[in-house]
Amino acid sequence: MAKVRLNLLNIFQLRINQKSIDYNGKTVGDIISQFLSEYRDKLDDELFDVKKKEFNAQILILLNGRNIKYLKNYKTNLKDGDELYLSYALAGG
């Protein structure tokens, strides 16, 4: 198991009232599952689709700055010291 830091950005930081949380896990999915088991009640349905059991399309999960969608998504393996970032994608002009 790897010791990983989950960094919470924008809406997640506001809802959870923390900047980061340390977890132990083997994959990105392990870390996200632990996070949701602790904090699901603080997230709106717009952020998390209960039926699909996944974050909505606007949620961005980065592993060391890389989008997990371009890796192995939730099955991406982790190593000690990895940093995950959980964010709501924002755009402006």
Task: Report residues per predicted region.
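Ubiquitin-like/PB1-type beta-grasp interaction modules and other compact soluble beta-rich domains
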Residues: 1-92
